């Protein structure tokens, strides 16, 4: 089982994750696209990496915006799994 990161570890990791912020016990970022199709294409791109990691984000889609929230539910907070998936998702948003 993954271990929760300390507040200092989270802060240090967020320095390398532009646009991501800590909101309570999760990481969050809202990505903006040209239109709804861009939003859905982004969501479709993140499905395979999330499945491969066995770690699934909470998503909110609103026309040209997708808000991604990451937390490790079984430990009740942010773990390295969240940081790693945030990096992958950030790379997927650049098209």
Swiss-Prot record:
> InterPro entries, from UniProt?
PCD_sf, Pterin_deHydtase
Swiss-Prot/TrEMBL keywords: Lyase
What does the record give under GO molecular function? 4-alpha-hydroxytetrahydrobiopterin dehydratase activity
| Top-level division of the source organism's lineage | Bacteria
Q: What's a Pfam family this protein contains?
A: Pterin_4a
EC code: 4.2.1.96
Which BP terms from GO are recorded? tetrahydrobiopterin biosynthetic process
Catalyzed reactions per annotation: (4aS,6R)-4a-hydroxy-L-erythro-5,6,7,8-tetrahydrobiopterin = (6R)-L-erythro-6,7-dihydrobiopterin + H2O
Catalytic EC class: lyase
* Gene3D superfamilies, alphabetized: Transcriptional coactivator/pterin dehydratase
Similarity comment: Belongs to the pterin-4-alpha-carbinolamine dehydratase family.
Q: What HAMAP family does this protein's entry cite?
A: Pterin_4_alpha
Protein's recorded name: Putative pterin-4-alpha-carbinolamine dehydratase
């Amino acid at each position: 089982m993954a271990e929760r990161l300390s507040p200092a570890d989270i802060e240090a990791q967020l320095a390398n994750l532009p646009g991501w912020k800590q909101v309570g016990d999760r990481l969050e970022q809202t990505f903006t696209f040209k239109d709804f199709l861009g939003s859905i294409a982004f969501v479709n791109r993140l499905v395979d990496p999330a499945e491969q990691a066995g770690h699934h984000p909470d998503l909110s889609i609103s026309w040209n915006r997708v808000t991604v929230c990451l937390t490790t539910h079984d430990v009740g907070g942010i773990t390295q799994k969240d940081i790693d998936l945030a990096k992958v998702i950030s790379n997927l948003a650049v098209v």
